[in-house]
Amino acid sequence: MADDHPQDKAERERIFKRFDANGDGKISAAELGEALKTLGSITPDEVKHMMAEIDTDGDGFISFQEFTDFGRANRGLLKDVAKIF
């Protein structure tokens, strides 16, 4: 799939970096859980479910590519998250 508007990519990068608390280039379940607490109450099961959905290669982390693919498939959700972060 062709890349989006450069502004969309920059927005995804900005959000990804906010979720990637330790700056290692990937989002762990713990980082995802901490970031999502900002959005409200979230259970460990909800974090596990989201990881399973977004972590398509099953390595236990969300790469920027996986985050991008999820963002493209869920543009409305990502825009809502962008307003908060």
Swiss-Prot record:
Which positions are annotated as binding Ca(2+) 1?
A: 20, 22, 24, 26, 31
Q: Write the record's keywords in alphabetical order, separated by commas.
A: Allergen, Calcium, Metal-binding, Repeat
Give start-end of the signal peptide.
Answer: none
Q: Does the keyword Calcium apply?
A: yes
Which amino acid positions bind Ca(2+) 2, per UniProt? 55, 57, 59, 66
State the protein's name: Polcalcin Bet v 4
Please state every residue range assigned to the domain named EF-hand. 7-42, 42-77
Which gene underlies this protein? Answer: BETV4
State how it assembles.
Monomer.
One of the Pfam families matching this protein, by short name:
EF-hand_7
| A single MF term (Gene Ontology) | calcium ion binding
